[in-house]
Amino acid sequence: MSFNFPTTDELNEQGFDKQFLSALTHVKKHMDEDSNTPIHFGAFIYFWERYLFAHADRLSENYKGGSWTLENGFWCLDSNDQFDVHTGYGAKYTVNAMEFSIIVNLFALSHMAITTYQQKGNEFINMLSVNFSDYIKLLLDRSLEKLNTEAIYMVTD
């Protein structure tokens, strides 16, 4: 699926700062051996990935692992499968792999933001968690016709 990605000017208008734009560039190049990812950013990627896998297992019984790639600002599950996900109040939705990826990323980033909130030394990870979550929500707003946004918002609410 292709997203209608915002331009740098549009991201600036949304309040994203240069530090986040630099981090987004690192994420987009993460799989490149020559990206020279800074150590503190590597720690952010490591924890994001750990929380991602834990939440994927918890959110859907259909999820049995798979190949995830970090591109375009978030982790994407490479799968043609459908995933059943439940809201906290009993409703069930069936989503495709892209929608499942977005849901799992939002849960993982939220968990990271809460865990690192006001922890001395983790301000950078907290800031990135919040900004990447906001970035994914911006992509959602720009892809309303392509995704089951009702399911994504209901499950993550």
Question: What do these predicted regions represent?
Answer:
Residues 39-83:
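Amphipathic, interaction-prone secondary-structure segments
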Residues 16, 26-32, 57, 61, ...:
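Generic surface-pattern signal
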Residues 82-157:
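Polybasic, proline/glycine-rich intrinsically disordered low-complexity segments
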Residues 15, 39-47, 54, 90-101:
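Alpha-helix boundary/N-cap detector
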